[in-house]
Amino acid sequence: MLERILTMKAEKTALILIEFQNDFCKEGGKLFGTVKKEIARNNTLKNAVRLLDGTRKKGGKIIHCPFILDRTWASSKDGLLKALADGDVFAPNSWGGKIIDELKPLNDEIVLQGKCCISAFEHTNLATILFELGIENVVVAGFLTNICVQATAWGAYDLGFHTRIIPDSCGAASQGIQEFVEREICPIFGSVPTVDDFLVELE
C-alpha cells in the first residue's frame, strides 16, 4: 500500500485522545491489569504525554474523549458494553472515569461529552465539532488500539478527514493485537506515524 506523508497545518488538525482514564492507565484501575504489560512495552503513556505537549506547542486542536458509562443502556447490550456495565467500569463521577493527571485537559481544550460506546462519533457531537472548527486532519491515540481507537479512526476517515492512528501512543491487551493493528489496519489510512513522525509533519 502506498504510504502518503502529510504536511499538516496545526490549525486544521485535531488530536483525539481516547480513554486516557484511570481505569485503563493507573494501578487500581479496573482495566489496568488488561493493558499493564503492553503499555509498559509500548511506552504508551510517556509517548502520549509527548504527543499532547507537542501538539499543544504547535497549536493543534485537542479533543479529550473519555468513556462515561451509561449503565442502563450498556447493560441491555451484549459483549463488551455489557461487561463494562457489569464491572461498573468508567462509572460517572468515579476515580476510574477521570482523565489521568498527566493528560489533564487545559481550560481551552474540548472534553467530549456522551461517549458511551465504541466509536467517539456515536451518540456524540464530535463530527459537528470537527466541521465547525474547520478540521481537515484527525489524529487518534488511546485505548484500546483495536477497539475504540480503530473505530474512531474509521469514523473520521469515512467523513472525509485525513486520518492517522499514532500506534506508539495507543494501548492494547497484547503485543499481538497491537502489532496486528499496526501492520494490517494503520497503513490503510495512509501511513503509520510515530509521535516523532507526526510532530515533524505538524506545522
For each predicted feature, which ranges?
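Active-site-adjacent betaalpha module
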Residues: 1-14, 49-58, 70-73, 81-203
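Acidic/histidine-rich helix-loop elements
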Residues: 25-41
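Charged catalytic carboxylate motif
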Residues: 43, 47
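N-terminal nucleotide-binding beta1-loop-alpha1 segment
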Residues: 16-21
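Metal-dependent active-site segment of extracytoplasmic phospho-/sulfohydrolases and closely related
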Residues: 61-63
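Short acidic/His/Gly/Ser-rich catalytic and metal-binding motifs that mark active-site loops
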Residues: 23-28, 72-74
